[in-house]
Amino acid sequence: MKIARIAFEEQTHYAIVDNEHFTFIQDDIFTAITPTKETCSLAQATILPPVIPSKIIALAVNYESHAKGHNMEAFPIPEPFFKTPSSIIGHKDDVILPQNVGRVDAEAEVVVVIGKQASKITACLLYTSDAADE
């Protein structure tokens, strides 16, 4: 199942995506995926960033091939850094670079979205429905 966050008729919705249209989802996608009868075609909506994060924590130089491409070694323990929530863009949106930015690295990213406040989640808790309650 593919889920997207979309803009349709000046409103934001989460929707199930199929080959021809979006089917809107009722309520909170972190609680249950409940489709409604309301739909729109793919061409009628704009695909938005999937979430509106309160913060973004990323890891620098966390894989060897990227480090080698910059004549560096991967960090033994990845270095966390923050990105601003405004750095998230939607499908086909322009990437706007600040003036004098220097170097820009194009990278594929893996993202974890946690739907509740969470702290100190252990590996064994990741696969349970109680993970965000810890």
Indicate residue ranges for each PLM-predicted region.
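N-terminal non-catalytic cap/leader segment that marks the start of a structured domain
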Residues: 1-78
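Conserved small/polar residues in nucleotide/adenosyl-binding loops
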Residues: 127-134
